Design a protein with these regions (language model features):
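Active-site-proximal beta-strand/loop segments in catalytic clefts of secreted hydrolases
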Residues: 36-37, 69-72, 96-97, 126-128
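N-terminal targeting signals for export/organelle localization
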Residues: 1-14, 123-126, 135, 146
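A short beta-strand-turn-helix
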Residues: 11-32
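Thiol/disulfide oxidoreductase modules built on the thioredoxin-like
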Residues: 82-89, 97-140
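Structural microenvironment flanking redox-active thiols in thiol-disulfide oxidoreductases
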Residues: 46-86, 98-103
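Conserved beta-strand segments of alpha/beta enzyme cores
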Residues: 65, 90-93
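Hydrophobic beta-strand anchors of alpha/beta hydrolase catalytic cores
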Residues: 33-34, 66, 113
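Short pre-active-site segment immediately N-terminal to redox-active cysteine/selenocysteine motifs
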Residues: 29-32, 37-40, 109
Length: 146
């Protein structure tokens, strides 16, 4: 069965510390990639860098949102902000500082990448190997119209 993102899910916060419900951030007709990452997670950063390299090409072909949700604790949030800014990542960056959202998704490992459509998780991937981003793009493409 598809896993839905419900409105009762824990909030995440943006760069300014404003709380947001992921449920409210998702557009029904638009694909959304959610990537759970942290500053101490090398594969996470490799994945986000790899997607950054092809991001503009993806955007030309497909209309999607990308939320990079950091599971860093409060102490590491500054570092996460600096890292994301320093790399000029085009993603919307959010924080899940108590890992409540991550727990609600029932996941314990990062990087953890999801594709969401109509508030349902239609694809989920754990870990990162070079080339995984191509597979992710193909999944986006497959689900864009149907």
């Amino acid at each position: 069965p598809m896993f839905k993102i419900f409105s009762c899910f824990p909030t995440i916060s943006d760069f300014e510390g404003k709380n947001e419900k992921v449920h409210n951030l998702l557009s029904n007709d638009k694909l959304t990639i959610i990537s759970l990452w942290a500053t101490w997670c090398v594969p996470c950063i490799k994945e986000l860098d790899a997607i950054n390299d092809v991001y503009d090409d993806w955007k030309e072909e497909i209309n999607f949102d990308f939320f990079a949700i950091s599971v860093d604790d409060s102490r590491s949030q500054k570092r996460a902000k600096a890292l994301a800014n320093g790399k000029s990542w085009p993603y919307q960056i959010f924080f899940d500082k108590n890992q409540d959202f991550k727990r609600a998704l029932g996941t314990s490992y990062i990087p953890q990448t999801f594709i969401i459509k109509n508030k349902e998780i239609i694809y989920q991937h754990t870990g990162y190997q070079p080339g995984d981003e191509e597979y992710l793009f193909n999944k986006l493409r497959e689900n864009e119209t149907n």
